[in-house]
Amino acid sequence: MRIVEQIKSEIRQALADAVSRAVAAGALVGPAPEVFLETPKAREHGDFATNLAMVMARQEKKAPRVIAQAIVDHLQTEGTWIESAEIAGPGFINLRLRQGWVHQVLPAIQAEGADYGKSDHGGKQRILLEYVSANPTGPMVLVQARAGAFGSSLARLLNWAGYECHTEFYVNDAGNQVKILARTVDLRAQELRGATVEIPEGYYPGEDVIDCARALLEQYPDFLEKPEEERLAFLERWAPEYFRSGHERVLRSYGVEFDRWFSERSLREAGAPARLVEWLKERGEAYEKDGAVWMRTTAYGDDKDRVLVKSDGEYTYFAADACYHKDKYDRGYATLIDILGQDHHGYLGRMKAMVECLGHPRDSLEILFTQMVRLFKDGQEFRMSKRRGNYVTLEDLLEQVSVDAARYFFLMRSLDTHMDFDLDLANLKSSDNPVFYVQYAHARICSILRQAREQGLEVPAASEVDTALLADESEVELMRKLAEFPEEIIGAADAREVHRIPRYLNELATLFHQFYSRCRVVSDDVPLSRARLLLVDCTRTVLANALGILGVSAPERM
């Protein structure tokens, strides 16, 4: 069991026992509800706090402070980690622990190493996370780069927290947009061979499609000699795959990989839309009107019913989405998480209704929205002068900053907030740069360990160290922060808040730098030096583990 959770479990039991004794003494009616603990923001308020007395106020028909006093009066701390309890504010009970508790974290970190922070909290609940899912009609742009960093990190967070999370990229390689892409590429290929062509309104502009046509002719020099119908049928498969493979290549260079690339075309060719429509009709969840087939989503809170099959017999994108989500559930996933662009916000109601219409709990589908990103350089919004058009791609960004900087900067902010990305700050080699600041803490520790090794000192086994020697305030605060890491993982995973990990890393790096400025790691005091080497090595482990969750490197030299 995680050391902090073990101690919290002991505290909960002690508080529940205190309520039972107060009930036996006639001071309270009882019984004790579930005990919740939180870590106070201000250290002077203790190590943990509980609102137990306020939760019990209604059943006890007493003021929370009176209830809190009864609990404290009957709290037995002997043989526990609880040193003292005091009542604060409207009825909080603040608890201070015996100082020795914090030293228990170092043996745990050393024993678990690269696994420190992992838990079985999620009980292996199966989660399918779909993210990025950019249309295969152009390059990867900034908002998708942000979603890529977030999604890949969230998947790792969920797995660390004990869930079984798999990832997918949904490839929209079917429908009208693919037909238009095929026609655009065909026209551009003719243009490259000297023909004068006009690109109709609604077709795909930009140099990327010209690059696609150029690659086509390099691979198939006699392509234009084929009949138009044959060319277009071929391009409806080839062109989306050209862009999809480009997405895969650039995403992999950015540290984003998927368990599966799921093709919309594969659903259509397998007859999934037709089976879905029949299945919904049999359940009374679909009906025909005006020559079209509609899903009865208003029965589940949508503002209007949604068309599945248009009057011309063409399946809608909504039908494809419904098929895809039904397929996810049919594969046994309990929770679905979709990360979409903010321009899809209007889809929320219909997607939730669709899930209920498919026979699943509304809250089993979670939709997270990615807000827009602006680049800044020299204090001004930065628009790259480039041939593609008015958008900036992930490849453009990675020409300006490192993968580590790009990922870390995207992950520092909550996904649902607009973001201004400072290119100058991301390239700064100083503590003002958040990712440099954290990575430098890791590199500095590696340097300390190398220097100690040169002096004949290795990191000792925790069992051979007197951790009680680590009594300086900076050492105690550093160990407290190390102890919080497993709980931080669980909290961030359950809240889907990846930005909590960069925040934790910044706080941990700050505490390490404060410790380093106050305490000499290697000195003439060998027992103390050994204890401090253990402390800094455990700090290195946690920094590396947290950076790894974010897909950011932990350099040994900088």
Curated annotation (Swiss-Prot):
Residues in coiled coil: none
Cited SMART domains: Arg_tRNA_synt_N, DALR_1
GO biological process, alphabetically ordered: arginyl-tRNA aminoacylation
EC category: ligase
A GO CC term assigned to this protein in UniProt: cytoplasm
UniProt cross-references to HAMAP family, sorted A to Z: Arg_tRNA_synth
Subunit structure: Monomer.
Protein's name according to its UniProt entry: Arginine--tRNA ligase
Gene from which this protein is expressed: argS
